[in-house]
């Protein structure tokens, strides 16, 4: 692609760095911005800068948030005892779009993938294990992409939850934790965020029990 302006070329190259944006799409976006008046372009750039500088991650679930707690964790109408474990923030948005889940989330920040150099220590698995007894979670729903890496992550976390349990101490109370995974309505190897809302909704409604654990209460 040959450009008559280095300013145009630089802008196109920056847009093309975004996921899923090729040079041709980047060019269309930049040319669209050129046609807009200064106020609209300034507003666009200000919104991007404000988002980048002020956006936070929820201290509880690691979802995107405007405050210390996201609007899902801080919502008293959500089922606080039902925890959905997802790979990334895009999966939270996909599941919320189905309007079939009214619990809370835990964002792992990825899945275990040794070939990509991603191990348990790079994810928020330890924080998840700590949340389960502390928040008296009754059901954990794994909503990970149906891949070998996703299944490996489910297996690892399930074993870690089992190993983490401890006999109830004085005043402690054991409670059963139901572990489920979404049904395989999504093709193996596919990614959760690309599933249509109806398929994803059915996968959540028809989730499959994995195993029951007894996690010691505090």
Question: Where are these predicted regions, by residue range?
Answer:
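Cys/His-rich Zn2+-binding cysteine-cluster or related metal-binding knuckle/ribbon modules and their
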Residues: 2-9, 30-92
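Conserved phosphate/pyrophosphate-binding and hydrolysis machinery centered on Walker-type P-loop NTPases
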Residues: 19, 38, 51, 63, ...
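Extended interfacial segments that mediate partner engagement and assembly in macromolecular machines
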Residues: 26, 75-144
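A structural micro-motif
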Residues: 103, 174-177
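Short Gly/Thr/Asp-enriched flexible loops that form oxyanion-binding sites at enzyme active sites
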Residues: 149-162
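Short Gly/Ser/Thr- and charged-rich N-terminal loops/segments
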Residues: 165-173
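Conserved phosphate-handling catalytic cores of large alpha/beta enzymes
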Residues: 176-184, 191-217
């Amino acid at each position: 692609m040959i450009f008559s302006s280095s300013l145009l070329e630089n802008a196109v190259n920056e847009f093309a760095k975004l996921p899923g944006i090729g040079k041709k799409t980047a060019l269309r976006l930049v040319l669209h911005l050129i046609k807009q008046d200064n106020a609209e372009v300034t507003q666009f750039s200000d919104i991007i800068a404000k988002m980048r500088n002020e956006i936070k991650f929820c201290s509880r679930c690691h979802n995107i948030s405007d405050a210390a707690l996201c609007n899902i964790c801080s919502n008293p109408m959500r089922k606080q005892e039902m925890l959905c474990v997802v790979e990334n923030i895009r999966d939270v948005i996909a599941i919320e779009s189905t309007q079939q889940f009214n619990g809370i989330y835990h964002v792992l920040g990825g899945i275990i993938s040794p070939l990509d150099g991603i191990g348990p220590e790079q994810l928020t698995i330890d924080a998840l294990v700590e949340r389960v007894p502390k928040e008296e979670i009754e059901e954990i729903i794994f909503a990970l992409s149906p891949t070998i890496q996703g299944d490996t992550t489910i297996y690892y976390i399930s074993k870690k939850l089992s190993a983490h349990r401890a006999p109830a101490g004085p005043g402690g109370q054991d409670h059963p934790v139901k572990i489920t995974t979404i049904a395989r309505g999504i093709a193996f190897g596919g990614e959760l965020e690309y599933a249509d809302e109806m398929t994803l909704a059915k996968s959540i409604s028809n989730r499959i029990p994995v195993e029951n654990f007894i996690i010691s209460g505090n």
